[in-house]
């Protein structure tokens, strides 16, 4: 009761209501970034598949080492990529950085598919290749995804940077979700 009484004694100046813009799609999605968003979504699908199902894939083809190290090597690759990719993006080579990352990821997926055949000839070499693939994949994804974020922010005017980041994260999350659903 005392709180209500105290609050009723507070006087504030009148402020006229602020006219708000109607809610529209362009407040949540950067329309100018939709082509890049589609590209990012498509690139996130194999990432979602890999991070969720690579351990089962390794066990199925006969790799018997601790497949959890795959993610350790992938994280090391992502850390390595940050050493040089940020400098290249700062120099304006965003699309070249994305293309390089894409090529590394494509190569790593072809190598990952070849493990099915390589393990029949040499188990140790296949295991080493498996972890090398994780390192290469980490470098590729570690190069691509931060460059995509910079691309989205650069496409947006200053007052829509939050919208640009929202578009980036939505594309990323939807791609990973599709990858998890379709990969299993």
What is each of the regions a protein language model found here?
Residues 69-78, 172:
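Transmembrane alpha-helical segments of major facilitator superfamily
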Residues 81-94:
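Helix-to-loop junctions at the C-terminal end of transmembrane segments
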Residues 93-148:
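C-terminal transmembrane helical hairpin of 12-TM major facilitator-type secondary transporters
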Residues 55, 178-184:
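Small-residue (Gly/Pro/Ala) motifs that create kinks and tight helix-helix packing interfaces
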Residues 1-17:
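C-terminal membrane-cytosol helix-exit motif in multi-pass small-molecule transporters
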Residues 33-71:
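Extracytoplasmic gate region of multi-pass secondary transporters
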Residues 64-65, 158-168:
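Loop-to-transmembrane helix entry/capping segments in MFS-fold secondary transporters
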Residues 75-83, 176-177:
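Residue-level signature of mid-helix packing/kink "hotspots" within the transmembrane helices
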């Amino acid at each position: 009761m005392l709180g209500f009484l105290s609050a009723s004694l507070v006087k504030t100046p009148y402020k006229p209501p602020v006219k708000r813009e109607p809610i529209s799609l362009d407040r949540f999605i950067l329309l100018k970034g939709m082509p890049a968003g589609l590209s990012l979504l498509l690139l996130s699908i194999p990432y979602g598949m890999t991070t969720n199902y690579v351990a089962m894939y390794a066990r199925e083809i006969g790799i018997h080492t601790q497949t959890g190290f795959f993610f350790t090597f992938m994280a090391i690759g992502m850390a390595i990529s940050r050493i040089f990719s940020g400098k290249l993006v700062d120099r304006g080579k965003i699309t070249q950085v994305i293309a390089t990352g894409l090529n590394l990821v494509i190569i790593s997926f072809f190598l990952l598919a070849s493990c099915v055949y390589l393990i029949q000839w040499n188990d140790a070499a296949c295991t080493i290749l498996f972890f090398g693939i994780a390192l290469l994949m980490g470098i590729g994804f570690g190069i691509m995804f931060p460059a995509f974020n910079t691309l989205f922010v650069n496409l947006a005017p200053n007052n829509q940077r939050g919208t640009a980041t929202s578009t980036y994260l939505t594309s990323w999350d939807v791609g990973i979700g599709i990858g998890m659903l379709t990969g299993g």
